[in-house]
């Protein structure tokens, strides 16, 4: 998206239409607000299941000892912590996040747990990654893509920084597949979740946005096609918990 088109175009922020140039600021405000309670937010949104989803996401990644991994939207460091055990002493991880508050929480948490070796923290925008071409074996993004303004550009950037033979994996809230469950899920998302956000964090608006952002995120087949358009091959996805989340993957050849 060019600078001139960004000034005139609009995009969604939850269910609101906003100027594309303003979305990054609005999203930043949300995550600055919830950064210290980010795990609580995910617990409320997923009823605690997000921890199992993340473990499965990393366990099924084709990551091996010695790999160099970029974890985008690295947040509070959950994925980096799991990946560190997989890449071993010779591997390295770059934890990237556009939000300084989230990055600070992740850094503090990993340092407190003694995870310091061969781990780098970079504040970066997924739409303009500050890395050379073909420098990572694996790129991951967990619960972050739906907050990106220009998802197509972010996917192309993920493709660019991957080595040939590398894999990109995206874990994201997606489209529920069971019709009978959709009303229950909607009730939890739009009625229960904002109230819990207010009760535990005195912040209903941020939690309402996060629920809305899930509904605006591309469904599984559309995101798979977007990854293909970005250059990835062997694109596919796996639904977890009835499509509440999906793991998308693609390879660079």
Swiss-Prot record:
BP GO terms, sorted: aerobic respiration; menaquinone biosynthetic process; methylation
Keyword terms, alphabetized: Menaquinone biosynthesis, Methyltransferase, S-adenosyl-L-methionine, Transferase, Ubiquinone biosynthesis
Enzyme Commission code(s) on record: 2.1.1.163, 2.1.1.201
GO terms, molecular function: 2-methoxy-6-polyprenyl-1,4-benzoquinol methyltransferase activity; demethylmenaquinone methyltransferase activity
One Pfam family named in its UniProt record: Ubie_methyltran
Catalytic reaction(s) noted: a 2-demethylmenaquinol + S-adenosyl-L-methionine = a menaquinol + S-adenosyl-L-homocysteine + H(+); a 2-methoxy-6-(all-trans-polyprenyl)benzene-1,4-diol + S-adenosyl-L-methionine = a 5-methoxy-2-methyl-3-(all-trans-polyprenyl)benzene-1,4-diol + S-adenosyl-L-homocysteine + H(+)
Signal peptide interval: none
Known pathway: Quinol/quinone metabolism; menaquinone biosynthesis; menaquinol from 1,4-dihydroxy-2-naphthoate: step 2/2; Cofactor biosynthesis; ubiquinone biosynthesis
Binding site for S-adenosyl-L-methionine: 76, 97, 125-126, 142
CDD domains with a match to the protein in the record: AdoMet_MTases (cd02440)
Enzyme class: transferase
Keyword Hydrolase: no
Function according to Swiss-Prot or TrEMBL: Methyltransferase required for the conversion of demethylmenaquinol (DMKH2) to menaquinol (MKH2) and the conversion of 2-polyprenyl-6-methoxy-1,4-benzoquinol (DDMQH2) to 2-polyprenyl-3-methyl-6-methoxy-1,4-benzoquinol (DMQH2).
Similarity comment text for this entry: Belongs to the class I-like SAM-binding methyltransferase superfamily. MenG/UbiE family.
Protein name: Ubiquinone/menaquinone biosynthesis C-methyltransferase UbiE
Species of origin: Xylella fastidiosa (strain M12)
């Amino acid at each position: 998206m060019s600078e001139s088109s960004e000034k005139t175009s609009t995009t969604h922020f939850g269910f609101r239409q906003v100027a594309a140039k303003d979305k990054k600021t609005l999203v930043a405000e949300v995550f600055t607000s919830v950064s210290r309670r980010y795990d609580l937010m995910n617990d409320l949104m997923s009823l605690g299941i997000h921890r199992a989803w993340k473990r499965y996401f990393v366990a099924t990644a084709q990551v091996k000892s010695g790999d160099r991994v970029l974890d985008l939207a690295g947040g509070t460091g959950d994925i980096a912590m799991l990946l560190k055990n997989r890449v071993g002493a010779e591997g390295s991880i770059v934890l990237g996040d556009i939000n300084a508050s989230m990055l600070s929480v992740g850094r503090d948490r990993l340092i407190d747990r003694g995870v310091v070796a061969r781990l780098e923290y970079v504040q970066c925008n997924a739409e303009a990654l500050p890395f050379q071409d073909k420098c990572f074996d694996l790129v991951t993004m967990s619960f972050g893509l739906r907050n990106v303004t220009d998802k197509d550009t972010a996917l192309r950037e993920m493709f660019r920084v991957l080595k040939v033979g590398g894999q990109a994996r995206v874990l994201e809230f997606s489209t529920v597949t069971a019709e009978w469950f959709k009303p229950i899920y909607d009730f939890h998302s739009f009625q229960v979740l904002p109230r819990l956000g207010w009760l535990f964090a005195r912040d209903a608006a941020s939690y309402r946005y996060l629920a809305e952002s899930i509904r605006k995120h591309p469904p599984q087949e559309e995101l798979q096609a977007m990854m293909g358009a970005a250059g990835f091959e062997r694109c596919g996805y796996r639904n977890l918990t009835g499509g509440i989340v999906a793991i998308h993957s693609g390879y660079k050849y």
